[in-house]
């Protein structure tokens, strides 16, 4: 009976950690993922932004990000000379935490399957490595400015 209880607790904790966070709103600039809150905190570098309310309204260049457009997706254009924000690919992030580079990464419950995807370092909050479906997987929460 204890084994069944422990198994249930482990499975439920993994399921809860993989739930999508409805409060996070993603933004993309120069094919790099960030958050709307991150860019709002750096308004001086933003030239313009365009908000798409649903994945169906995304232009062709942003269709590959439709999986993170549950709450809409914002396309940000950064002013010339301000493109130097820290960035990291998910493969590099996996490598830093001892996880195989091609392993998907979870960001606020959204599964990023393509590990060549780049994210801005400013969006990163807590990073945890957890067991997910029998494999070590990186789980990332965004910084307090969502």
Residue ranges and their predicted role:
Residues 1-22:
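Bacterial Sec-dependent N-terminal signal peptides
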